[in-house]
């Protein structure tokens, strides 16, 4: 769904109250071959078998911001293994209110890279849950991190997200959010839509920006793809912590991409 005001579809987005550290990892997919016209009987692009990925551009940016400690971490699997294994890009944002946020973020990135390549993308949510359980047992809820993990195989994209970090897609000049932030605000909105209380109360609740899911939680729920998402020529992906997406407007993010 387009996330900028000039799109034909309008949706609301409530920004978090505080901006965290700035970290963005941009995956720019610049395919050199021209697009072919789709035949009338061609399968839906989301489920169609993806073709090869001729050209892939990568870039990353990390900043400390106003914090004294960098609690964000990111990593990319070896590009030399792109054709054999695909590519994994991981971003973690350590939870600033927890003592071990930075450490857990770094260890989570390392863990994901050590597990890749995995045999079955559908098994990744369970791998993440197992890791989160280990983190919980070690830190007893006193440390945590968000997670965005994107896997590219040819033109197929799989992803798993935990917490309030973002995965954006820029396509034909429009910005789309591919994941849903796991914040208390979204749970409140669903309850408000059921008639429990006004939607305005959900958006102004003092705990609206609190995370409902994070690595380090005992019983974790991931936001993951079940079917691969097919990328198109000139698509661009952005893995971003809330330090970027809560500081910049969606139009600024789109223009920067």
For every predicted segment, state its role.
Residues 2-257:
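PP2C/PPM-type serine/threonine phosphatase catalytic domain
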């Amino acid at each position: 769904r387009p996330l900028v005001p000039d799109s034909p579809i309008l949706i609301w987005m409530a920004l978090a109250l505080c901006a965290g550290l700035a970290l963005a990892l941009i995956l720019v997919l610049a395919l050199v071959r021209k697009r072919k016209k789709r035949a009338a009987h061609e399968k839906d692009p989301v489920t169609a078998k993806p073709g090869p990925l001729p050209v892939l551009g990568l870039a990353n940016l990390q900043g400390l911001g106003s914090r004294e400690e960098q609690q964000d971490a990111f990593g990319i699997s070896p590009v030399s293994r792109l054709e054999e294994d695909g590519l994994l890009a991981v971003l973690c944002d350590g939870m600033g209110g927890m003592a071990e946020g930075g450490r857990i973020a770094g260890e989570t990135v390392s863990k994901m890279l050590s597990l890749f390549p995995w045999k079955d993308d559908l098994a990744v949510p369970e791998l993440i849950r197992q890791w989160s359980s280990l983190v919980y047992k070690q830190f007893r809820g006193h440390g945590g991190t968000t997670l965005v993990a994107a896997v590219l195989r040819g033109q197929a994209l799989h992803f798993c997200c935990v917490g309030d970090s973002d995965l954006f897609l820029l396509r034909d000049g429009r910005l789309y959010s591919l994941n849903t932030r796991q914040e208390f605000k979204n749970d409140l909105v669903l309850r408000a839509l059921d008639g429990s209380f006004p939607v305005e109360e959900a958006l102004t609740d003092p705990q609206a920006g609190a995370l409902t899911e994070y690595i380090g939680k005992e019983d974790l729920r991931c936001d993951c793809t079940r079917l691969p998402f097919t990328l198109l020529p000139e698509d661009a992906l952005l893995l971003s912590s809330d330090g970027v997406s809560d500081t910049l407007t969606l139009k600024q993010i789109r223009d920067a991409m």
